């Protein structure tokens, strides 16, 4: 893809730093892609990507998100639409805790990984940063407890985002969605279609709050 992957742009390798509307657009595009895989529309039965992460979100010339690398994808056969027992594969930092402890792969395993990517979009940090101390390497563990605290939430916002590009209300809504996606129990997480709807609302809330127009795509 012409613009590389999402992690490149979040960690300063890409040619430009993304503002908040661009990040919301990418989150929404990725959510739609996962929702499509989960819906049975692609091949007639649900598909779990199993390795969704920021390096597998590619950006085209218009900064639209395209999901890549389906090498670990798993079909959920008829009669097993909720879960399938599978060897634990994926990328450290994006693993669904329930999947790693039980070996049962579900659509919600992708939702957890999607939540991690949402946190990367919000903070500009990596899912795992080995340059940090042992207790601060895992992004989810580092920020999960303050995602719904508006006062502390401000400290998590990527400083490379222009302050005029976001509203605190949209940030809070986005952080709340991310916090629910990375809940330990898979049954407590939203579905990908629900994520799509909530991100559309976050996008519109940000546009309305800023008083400007921006094409959602």
Model-identified regions with their sequence ranges:
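Conserved eukaryotic protein kinase-like
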Residues: 1-217
């Amino acid at each position: 893809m012409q613009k590389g992957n999402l992690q490149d742009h979040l960690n300063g390798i890409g040619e430009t730093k993304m503002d908040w509307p661009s990040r919301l657009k990418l989150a929404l595009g990725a959510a739609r892609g996962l929702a499509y895989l989960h819906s049975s529309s692609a091949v007639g039965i649900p598909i779990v990507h199993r390795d969704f992460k920021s390096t597998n979100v590619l950006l085209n010339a218009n900064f639209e998100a395209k999901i890549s690398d389906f090498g670990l994808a798993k079909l959920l056969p008829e009669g097993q639409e909720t879960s399938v027992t599978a060897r634990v594969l994926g990328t450290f930092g994006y693993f669904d805790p329930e999947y790693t402890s039980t070996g049962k792969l579900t659509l919600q395993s992708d939702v957890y990984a999607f939540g991690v990517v949402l946190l990367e979009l919000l903070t500009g940090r990596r899912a795992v940063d080995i340059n940090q101390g042992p207790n601060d390497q895992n992004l989810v563990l580092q920020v999960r407890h303050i995602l719904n605290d508006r006062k502390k939430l401000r400290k998590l916002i990527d400083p490379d985002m222009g302050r005029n590009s976001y509203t605190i209300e949209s940030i809070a809504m986005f952080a709340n969605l991310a916090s629910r996606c990375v809940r330990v129990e898979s049954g407590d997480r939203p579905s990908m279609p629900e994520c799509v709807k909530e991100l559309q609302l976050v996008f519109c809330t940000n546009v309305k709050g800023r008083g400007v127009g921006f094409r959602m795509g």
